[in-house]
Regions:
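N-terminal helical cap/lid subdomain that shapes the substrate entry/recognition surface
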Residues: 10-119, 126-127, 140
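Asp-based, Mg2+/Mn2+-dependent phosphohydrolase catalytic module
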Residues: 1-16, 24-26, 47-50, 118, ...
């Protein structure tokens, strides 16, 4: 961490993304199949898991388009009763919304912690940095549960998810609220993410002092606008989350 920490001398708080930063997605088909089966069982449909979940994915893409355009995140109950499964009785679906969201995310694949992630968190915390999480996710419970399972909850002073806040990155309000909860001025905050357009644009607008990008493989060859250039990227990848 020596080289990475040298860049952060003026930073008091470090906020981390979840997807492709703290965790990676493994598209393991048996795992996905089991989740699809659980979804149809919870919903109570007679359709096959494959047919039903194919339509579910189509509807989710429509929802994502709306969410991107409006920088908003719907509550899980509304996501299911209005967006993903509106043809089923709301009074039956609403109590199942959180579990349905969890299983829907599992139907995309198994999420595992990035290599070296825990050691990085421990190291940054030991050096006195205030740590936080800012992430766009449709679930309100999966991330807190994961942090508890990995005994990481105590390391994060501020955990802000779009699903609970209602606004998505790159809306600057989600970054500003996370900094407020951490009790650190935005200019003394750094953000570590994987997306040039979302993570750089939002943190810049919020006045964060530094943006660090560990780009996903699919993004590395894409053109990046000048205003989307981070402060640091690949040169610190070995010092932070070795994926």
């Amino acid at each position: 961490l020596t080289a990475f920490l040298g860049y952060l001398m003026a930073v008091a708080a470090i906020f981390l993304d979840i997807g492709n930063t703290l965790r990676i997605l493994l598209k393991e088909e048996p795992y996905r199949t089991e989740a699809r089966q659980k979804i149809v069982s919870l919903i109570g449909t007679s359709e096959s898991p494959e047919v039903f979940c194919t339509e579910l994915e189509r509807r989710y893409k429509e929802y994502r388009k709306w969410a991107f355009e409006h920088l908003s995140e719907a509550p899980e109950e509304e996501l299911w009763t209005r967006g993903l499964a509106p043809e089923f009785p709301a009074q039956r679906i609403t109590p199942l919304a959180h579990e349905l969201t969890y299983q829907f995310r599992q139907s995309m694949g198994r999420r595992v912690m990035a290599d070296g992630c825990k050691e990085v968190i421990h190291g940054l915390h030991a050096r006195g940095y205030t740590l936080g999480i800012i992430s766009n996710v449709i679930t309100t419970s999966e991330i807190p549960n994961w942090l508890a399972e990995e005994d990481l909850t105590r390391y994060f002073k501020s955990v802000l998810l779009s699903s609970s806040f209602g606004r998505r990155k790159p809306d600057p309000s989600i970054y500003l609220e996370a900094a407020r909860r951490a009790e650190v001025a935005p200019e003394k905050c750094a953000y570590v993410g994987d997306n040039f357009s979302r993570d750089v644009t939002g943190t810049r607008a919020a006045g964060f002092g530094m943006v660090i990008i560990l780009p996903d493989t699919a993004e590395k060859d894409e053109a990046v606008a000048p205003q989307q250039q981070p402060d640091l990227q690949d040169q610190i990848q070995q010092e932070i989350l070795k994926r």
